Amino acid sequence: MAWFTTVLIVASLLGSLVAQPITYTLVPTSSIPSQPTTSNERNKSCRLAIEELGALVQLLKELSSDESSGARLSEDVIVKLVNALIYVATYTCKGTGYNTTPLDILCDGVCGVGAGRGAEMEGKPRSGAGKGAEMEGKPKSTESVAETNTVAAGTGVVAEKTGTESSAS
């Protein structure tokens, strides 16, 4: 009889657990705040976006030098991430006084920087910001993609440490 009572208690507990909704906490994977509110937060957000972009560009450079067949998909994914982060960096750095032109040097022909300039890899236009570039490091002209990205991005680029903005369109 005690065994039967124990089974009923366990069954009722399990039933009550199943009936309750299960909730999960979202844990952000990026250290970049989504909507910085203060000047300090904007500066930190801008700096973090540029640092994370640098790490992705390093990974992209390593993948582009790897000739294995599996690296192609990874390069494609990394290029999309780099372009998305360039957009984030351009948006979060706007008005902070940060100079984003060193990102051109950081990419060194592997990717490009600048809102409104299309990125290209293996002859296919890519969405996002960036100067047109192929994985071999040869810049490509992407004027038609540039116009599309300027409208899509709608952001400005930061001028030299003055805090003034110049339009990317």
Curated annotation (Swiss-Prot):
Domain of life: Eukaryota
Keyword Magnesium listed: no
Compositional bias ranges of the Polar residues kind: 142-152
Keyword terms: Repeat, Signal
Tetradecapeptide repeat placement: 114-127, 128-141
Disulphide-bridged cysteine pairs: none
Keyword field contains Nucleotide-binding: no
Stretch forming the signal peptide: 1-19
Region (Disordered): 119-169
Function, as annotated: This protein is one of two components of the prominent 'filler' that helps mold the shape of aeropyle crowns.
Name of the protein described by the UniProt record: Chorion protein E1
